[in-house]
Amino acid sequence: MTTKTSNETYGAGTVVDSEFSPLPAECERILRIFAARTPGFTKDEALLSGVNFHGDDLPCIPGPIKSQAVTAVLHAMVGIVGLEILHLRGVTTDNQIDIDVNHAGLYPATAALVDIDGVTGPEVIKLPTVPQWDKDRASNSPLVYRATAIYETADSGVWFQLHGSLDSWKVLALLGIGKDLDSEIRTNDAAYELIQERVRKYRAREIEQLVVEKGLSGSIVYSPEEWRQTEMGRSLSRHPLVNYKQKSHCATLAPASFPVLEDKRPLAGIKVVELTRIIAGAAAGAALASLGAEVIRVNSSKLKDYTPAQPSSLMAGKKTIDLDLEDPADHKKLMQLFEQADVILQGYRLGSLARRGFGLEAALELANKRGRGVVYVDENCYGPDGYYAERPGWQQVADAAAGSSYVMGQSFGFPKGQGVLPSLPISDMSTGILTALTIMCGIRDRAKFGGSYHGHASLTAYNMATLDSEVRLYQREVVQKISDKYEFPTWSSDVHVAPLYYSILDAWGKKSELIKDEKHYIHFSDSVFGSDLRVLGPVVRYDKEEYSPKWNSPPVPFCHHEFTMFSNQ
């Protein structure tokens, strides 16, 4: 059993283990912490002890943050709620769940773990079968590339995470950098130097205010303690990580029974509308699809999105349609899907869909009319309330805000205050499984108690959970052992997330069998991307294949299908 020591090794507010606990045992410890803190989560020891965490003792993700353990635990919690639903459906009385912690370690790299007919790595998105949804990022412009990085401000020891989002030129214009400079700046290093020169003219609060005023994304790099002392940090701290509640004015709706189907997976027959972009929401939808839900993902072909998601398991098991909510005909089509849906998963800025008639209140009204509850879950960067709740945000921004980037910088020995990205899209992918867990709790409770449910999951809340004083951080000597085993590269504040995670995969491939283990993958021979598509499979495994998570159809591009209603079940 590990004990804690508040020695602030990685900055203010950090708590470090006094001794190392093997990863499977650490997962068991954290599972019980999360179970005790989560309202409505089972305290049944048969279910908690039924989780079999197994795999390597040493984590495979670089750095002191226990990302791999927390991600494995969130998958285990999904598995537990899935079993509770299976019990309600009368499918099984089994309590056993298998979580391979090595597989959970690969999970944050899902979008990069794609093999199309032998093509892997960054070459995948260059294939003609993969549609391009963000041509600016594919433009090879160094300025666009460096618009997303961490820069030092005029305040000594205070850094800022700039983020180009899906329109880097808006962010660059804020700094007085226009497209006219694009032809002059021909290297990534030159671009970083120019942007650093401009950012250093501002104090941290000044550039934060500019970004907020323009509706753009970015954050000061806070230490964990500094973030907790902000008003937004305090707002998030008031909510549990798995954050959902029954809506009181819908409580009279009767419990919603599950359909009796040949498909024995927990969510078979559950209808999900996925209104998301980029990674976290897509990961949530994919998890629900693997558990049997019918997921219809709605994109607009007029909006940019994350190209690498398409051939990965982020898009497996779904139908993807193209709707423009400014078009009255498409607006009507989405309303028809809302009328049928059991679950609304939305990952746009808070209030954005409500202004178009597709917010929580509209969904609750439709549920009341049909006499069957709905589960509506928002996924965003900053959480359900507080002065930043409606701001746009990305994984890197949440990492900077909550203190994850600060901790990584300290683990590398950089000066106090300098931020460095975590190695993978960890908060994105893990918030995805957190979102799926939140939805599943609502589905379970709708079946038990009736009513409708509203939930919320956020990137920053996930990061705060990994930096919690009870979860703790790894000691420096453990971090060094991880680095020595895989010979990970070091990186600095200028790194871009895509080449960073490919470098992590390269280290895994050279120094271990981790990414070569076929049991972590599934193959599709009927994919539009190629004749043999290999992607990362679901992490949760049950004792019997008939109700274990799986995808019945391969990943597809965005907007791939014609408009369709949910199947009648």
UniProtKB/Swiss-Prot annotation:
The keyword Transferase applies. The keyword Kinase does not apply. InterPro entries: CoA-trans_III_biosynth/detox, CoA-Trfase_fam_III, CoA-Trfase_III_dom_1_sf. It comes from the Eukaryota. Keywords: Acyltransferase, Transferase. It is an enzyme of class 2 (transferase). One of its GO terms (molecular function) is acyltransferase activity. Disruption phenotype: Does not affect tolerance to 2-benzoxazolinone (BOA). Pfam families: CoA_transf_3 (PF02515). Its EC number is 2.8.3.-. Induction: Expression is induced in response to 2-benzoxasolinone (BOA) exposure. PANTHER family: ALPHA METHYLACYL-COA RACEMASE-RELATED, CAIB/BAIF FAMILY ENZYME (AFU_ORTHOLOGUE AFUA_1G05360)-RELATED. Belongs to the CoA-transferase III family. Fusarium verticillioides possesses 2 unlinked loci, FDB1 and FDB2, necessary for detoxification of antimicrobial compounds produced by maize, including 2-benzoxazolinone (BOA). The FDB2 cluster arose as a duplication of the FDB1 cluster with rearrangement and expansion by incorporating additional genes. Acyl-CoA transferase; part of the Fusarium detoxification of benzoxazolinone cluster 2 (FDB2) involved in the degradation of benzoxazolinones produced by the host plant. Maize, wheat, and rye produce the 2 benzoxazinone phytoanticipins 2,4-dihy-droxy-7-methoxy-1,4-benzoxazin-3-one (DIMBOA) and 2,4-dihydroxy-1,4-benzoxazin-3-one (DIBOA) that, due to their inherent instability once released, spontaneously degrade to the more stable corresponding benzoxazolinones, 6-methoxy-2-benzoxazolinone (MBOA) and 2-benzoxazolinone (BOA), respectively. This is Acyl-CoA transferase FVEG_12629. The lineage of its organism: Eukaryota, Fungi, Dikarya, Ascomycota, Pezizomycotina.
